[in-house]
């Protein structure tokens, strides 16, 4: 996303200063919410929550709000996009190494999947992108959080679809309001898209974009609908957005 672009544009000394400024804001939020920082990854981090998934989601929302409240000095005037992805599943944590060089290691298919989701969060404009499996572990998810179904990812090895949620409590106020106002139309559009009713879905995404012209997910769906609805074999297109 934009944050990675900013990091790559800086000289090495400025780059590490910016990364450390960001991590100094992120790590306390993870610690205070009961998370464990497993590793620092590029310009971000991987955190593990072993008990309550709502703590992980609450921390994700807080991370976005924390960074928005205090811009790192090295970012300058450039727009700073920050994205959090959440998945849930089993993980093995152990110590690896030899002699005096030992470190903790986490082995889990879900950490790899979470990393796969990171560019998708930026692509579809989700500050917090969460899998349906993780959301399903939170009681009253739909009532406690503001979220919309973005669509589906095909899990190739498991031959199943995983729902993705854009939890927009982590967005800035105007974006949050616009996503809530257009949520019903957007989700109806996604449902029609998944039913291969591309023309009708297209009309709904146009309505969404009239109200929220910066909606990246709606723009992507509109592009797909414009491409598909004229085709003779349109029903053969997949209902999912990405394949893992």
What is the role of each PLM region?
Residues 3-6, 96-104, 174-175:
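Short hinge/gating elements
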């Amino acid at each position: 996303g934009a944050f990675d672009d900013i990091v790559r544009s800086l000289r090495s000394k400025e780059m590490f200063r910016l990364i450390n400024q960001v991590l100094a804001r992120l790590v306390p939020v993870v610690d205070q919410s009961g998370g464990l920082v497993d590793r620092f990854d590029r310009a971000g981090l991987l955190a593990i929550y072993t008990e309550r998934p709502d703590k992980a989601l609450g921390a994700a929302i807080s991370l976005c709000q924390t960074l928005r409240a205090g811009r790192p000095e090295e970012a300058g005037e450039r727009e700073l996009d920050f994205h959090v992805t959440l998945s849930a599943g089993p993980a093995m944590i152990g110590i690896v190494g030899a002699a005096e060089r030992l470190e903790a290691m986490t082995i889990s298919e879900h950490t790899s999947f979470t990393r796969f989701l990171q560019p998708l969060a930026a692509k579809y404009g989700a500050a917090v992108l969460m899998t349906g499996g993780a959301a399903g572990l939170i009681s009253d998810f739909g009532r406690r959080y503001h979220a919309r179904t973005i669509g589906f990812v095909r899990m190739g090895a498991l031959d199943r679809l995983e729902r993705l949620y854009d939890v927009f409590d982590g967005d800035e106020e105007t974006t949050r309001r616009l996503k809530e106002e257009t949520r019903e139309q957007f989700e109806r559009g996604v449902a029609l898209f998944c039913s291969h009713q591309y023309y009708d879905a297209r009309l709904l995404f146009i309505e969404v974009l009239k109200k929220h012209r910066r909606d990246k997910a709606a723009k992507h769906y509109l592009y797909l609908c414009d491409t598909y609805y004229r085709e003779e074999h349109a029903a053969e297109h997949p209902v999912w957005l990405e394949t893992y």
